[in-house]
Swiss-Prot record:
One of its GO terms (cellular component) is glycine cleavage complex. This is Aminomethyltransferase. The lineage of its organism: Bacteria, Pseudomonadati, Pseudomonadota, Gammaproteobacteria, Legionellales. It comes from the Bacteria. Belongs to the GcvT family.
């Protein structure tokens, strides 16, 4: 039986086409994935992301624990109300998940994890927390809404209570704030500015309806996928997993090597890989002819082993097919993609195509 978020009946009332997403009945679109994509790039759209896993790490040992658990270093968080993106790796450097950690207080951290990895992640975090002065709380009584786009914050502020407006209006990117049991973060998964809002389940429907009345477009998983692909944001389980490392996934920037004695989980394996040099890297591909690149297609590189498309689609913003691909490190400026038996040329570039609505 599929799980449902507290907004399930609201999605149906809005005309959503629902699909099974890792055991959750979630909206794919509300009639036009294309219109939803453009709404986020040009105005404001909202996504129900209540299927995500929210875990609060409480206690005096929170910072010490997270410095061991994550590849990025929470010591970079210099004050409460800051967020940090990181990978969480196993002892071999394989990515268990990617996540955002928010410091709400010196003894209160919130991590938001992927829904597909909920059981694995929570079990891993719980096991690794032994010996640290921390307690874990999985917050299933909370719902989460992402409001994204150039007008997202302004439209959100227009429907909030004055106390919320005062707190949210001063947030800068990757900052967060708690107000009256509501949690606001200036983060997202679209490449646009916006907010991710976490509230008790009983408030989420009213928040959705207020945003709808303010002109925010409901958006489904389809638009979320093309938006994040254009922005070069990876999808766990598709672009990376426990068989790949941050260094092979364009995420070396999330690994903090110093101080050397921090000894985060997987550090030894990643240091070794860094010293030996990676054999595979993540790139962006832009198709130079007709066709659509899709997950799993082969990338043909002259004189090298084949690469693989990890994510591919049509880009509504660029109006051509784009993809993320893992290829041999020697790969040059052009490759061939096997699309249904036809070899189509593609240009190799950085694994990011759009920044704040503009081509990179």
């Amino acid at each position: 039986m599929t799980a449902k978020t507290p907004l399930h009946t609201t999605h149906l009332a809005c005309g959503a086409k629902m699909v099974d997403f890792h055991g959750w009945d979630m909206p794919l679109h509300y009639g036009s994935q294309l219109n939803e994509h453009h709404a986020v790039r040009n105005d404001a759209g909202m996504f129900d992301v209540s299927h995500m896993t929210i875990v609060d790490i409480l206690g005096a040992g929170g910072r010490q624990f997270l410095r061991k658990l994550l590849t990025n270093d929470v010591d970079q968080i210099t004050h409460n109300g800051k967020a940090l993106y990181s990978c969480m790796c196993n002892e071999h450097g394989g990515i268990i998940d990617d996540l955002i950690v928010y410091q709400r207080a010196s003894d209160n951290y919130r991590v938001v994890l992927n829904s597909a990895t909920r059981q694995n992640d929570v079990a891993w975090i719980r096991a690794k927390s032994e010996g640290f002065a921390v307690g874990l709380q999985e917050r299933r009584e909370l719902s989460m809404l992402a409001v994204q786009g150039p007008n997202a914050i302004a439209k959100t502020l227009s429907i909030l209570a004055p106390a919320h407006v005062d707190a949210v209006s001063t947030l800068t990117p990757f900052e967060c704030v708690d107000v009256d049991h509501w949690f606001f973060a200036r983060t997202g998964y679209t490449g646009e500015d916006g907010l991710e809002i976490i509230v008790p389940n009983e408030f989420i429907t009213q928040l959705w309806n207020d945003l709808l009345n303010a002109g925010v477009t409901p958006c489904g998983l389809g638009a979320r996928d093309t938006l994040r692909l254009e922005a070069g944001m990876l999808l766990y389980g598709q672009d990376m997993d426990e068989t790949t490392t941050p260094l092979e996934s364009g995420l070396a920037w999330t690994v903090k090597w110093e101080p050397e004695d921090r000894g985060f989980i997987g550090m030894g394996a990643l240091v070794s890989q860094k010293q030996q040099g990676i054999k595979r890297k993540m790139v962006g591909l832009t198709l130079l002819d007709k066709g659509i690149m899709r997950h799993g297609q082969k990338v043909i590189i002259e004189g090298c082993p084949d690469g693989i498309i990890t994510s591919g689609s049509y880009s509504p913003t660029l109006q051509q097919s784009i993809a993320l691909a893992r290829v041999p490190v020697e790969t040059g400026e052009q490759v061939l993609v096997d699309i249904r038996g036809k070899l189509i040329p593609a240009k190799v570039g950085k694994p990011r195509f759009i920044k704040q609505g503009k081509p990179v």
